[in-house]
């Protein structure tokens, strides 16, 4: 699995417990890896690599990604992800020559009210993963409410997040200092 390999290259400890069953421990993440040519190549071959940006932004104040490749099932926008991060206080940058996206924040992200222009499942998930560690309250209107997102929110709550509205298109997140 390319995403598991990518996480391992970032320094995440990975334990395979059985078929399709893994444990991940991300206590020593090498954020500098995000700026390497190896990451640009690896991340660019996987559409799902966008999903690491929100958690990295929340924990380390930065998240970078090459233009995602992978499957070719039509056009899927990234702007919902980045607009959500900007609403939380991040600054966006794009390096045209490398097709490399980045978001950065000084200090913690700040909770915000936001209306998503599309109910993107991955966009909502990425914003939720960033907002759980933001300072204050984040309210997401027009949030996706698919089962995948409900499972993610329930898992985050079991780790100490404070998310309400799970399963609806209005999600409220009270930011916490850390997850366990």
Language model region names:
Residues 1-180:
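Structural preference for solvent-exposed beta-strand-turn elements
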């Amino acid at each position: 699995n390319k995403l598991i390999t990518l996480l391992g290259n970032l320094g995440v400890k990975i334990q395979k417990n059985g078929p399709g069953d893994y444990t991940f421990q991300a206590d020593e993440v090498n954020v500098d890896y995000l700026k390497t040519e190896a990451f640009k190549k690896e991340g660019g071959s996987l559409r799902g690599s966008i999903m690491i940006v929100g958690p990295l932004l929340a924990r380390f104040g930065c998240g970078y990604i090459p233009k995602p490749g992978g499957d070719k099932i039509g056009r899927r926008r990234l702007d919902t992800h980045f607009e959500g991060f900007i609403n939380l206080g991040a600054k966006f940058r794009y390096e045209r020559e490398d097709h490399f996206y980045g978001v950065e924040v000084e200090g913690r992200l700040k909770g915000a009210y936001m209306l998503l222009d599309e109910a993107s499942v991955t966009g909502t998930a990425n914003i939720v993963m960033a907002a759980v560690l933001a300072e204050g309250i984040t309210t997401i209107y027009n949030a996706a409410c698919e089962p995948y997102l409900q499972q993610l929110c329930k898992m985050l709550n079991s780790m100490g997040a404070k998310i309400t509205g799970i399963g609806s298109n209005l999600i409220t997140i009270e930011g916490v200092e850390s997850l366990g």
